[in-house]
Amino acid sequence: MSTARLKINLDALAINWRNLDAKTNCETAAVVKANGYGLESGRVGKALAQAGARNFFVAIAEEGIALRRALGPGPGISVFAGHMEGDAKLLRDFQLTPMLNSLDQMLRHFESLPGHPFGVQLDSGMNRLGMEAAEWMAVRDIALDQNPVLLMSHLACSDEPGHGMNAYQLKNFIEMTEGLNIPRSLAATGGLLLGRDYHFDLCRPGIGLYGGAPYADALPVVELEVPVIQVRDLAPGESVGYGNTWIAQRDSKIATIAGGYADGLHRAFQRQGIMAYAGGTPCPVVGRISMDLITVDVTDLAEVPPYLSLMNETQTVDVLANAADTIGYEVLTSLGNRYARTYSA
């Protein structure tokens, strides 16, 4: 079998949610956008619901369909993108709650789905989504008359606890919402870890659930094992892969494994170098990562196993991300469709 195995530990996912929830004195929701950060939103959502999550967030209305089918009619599912043109039927049929981002969305929602639950997203300084303070003040009374279920905003720099932007956005959010008897939410994973001043009524962790930074105590949720297709011997001076970027300095043994950038194993991982693991033994990935293949120096192994591990407790999502000068979010959500996904609980 030449398919790589992506092992997803749903117990670790649930423990991460419970441990984050224990840091708050408010409700803890769960963000399962981008198909559950690449791990399949239905499976992830069910595990988180069993752990205790009662509210979930997705990016766009279409993502809510599979999640609602998996969760059934009870839990809340909110949509960050709000109420886009053509969304009314999806929002109604799948009981999705849009986080309205603008006056246009507000008018669209009130006209097409009167009485349907909604929240409002406010821009506290990130300048990405949400109503700015002046726009909010102009329509606030209209919105409040329709009974929003949540007022929310999003932090730009919460992964940097000492960044002044955090306090600035907190101040702005308080000024925009103070005195209103509506549940509020500001914190994702990073904001939750900043402390209870940022928690309000609901926290909505995402990446921390899946084992990623900035939640340093997160349990790893994913393991990736890639099958060995072929092993060959090289003499000193022979090269490996495109561009001859790696040249053997000694008698070497090279394993070619069945994964590549088409599977989300980016060429950029080679900027700082990554390892493939045979049990606990690291073996350097050498040469360029190509679309479907990766080459590994297994010279020092007594025996080459049928699979080598690229993601595990040692080489985590964030270790891979750092090697490519990116973030764990990008690594997780890039994991391709060719993997055989298995789930343990």
Curated annotation (Swiss-Prot):
UniProtKB keywords: Isomerase, Pyridoxal phosphate
Modification type N6-(pyridoxal phosphate)lysine: residues: K33
EC main group: isomerase
Upper taxonomic lineage: Bacteria, Pseudomonadati, Pseudomonadota, Alphaproteobacteria, Rhodobacterales
Protein name in UniProt: Alanine racemase
Biological processes, Gene Ontology terms: D-alanine biosynthetic process
Pathway noted in the entry: Amino-acid biosynthesis; D-alanine biosynthesis; D-alanine from L-alanine: step 1/1
Any one Gene Ontology cellular component term annotated for this protein: cytosol
Active site per database record: K33 (proton acceptor), Y242 (proton acceptor)
Family statement: Belongs to the alanine racemase family.
Function: Catalyzes the interconversion of L-alanine and D-alanine. May also act on other amino acids.
Chain sites annotated for binding substrate: R128, M291
InterPro entries: Ala_racemase, Ala_racemase/Decarboxylase_C, Ala_racemase_C, Ala_racemase_N, PLP-binding_barrel
One Pfam entry name: Ala_racemase_C
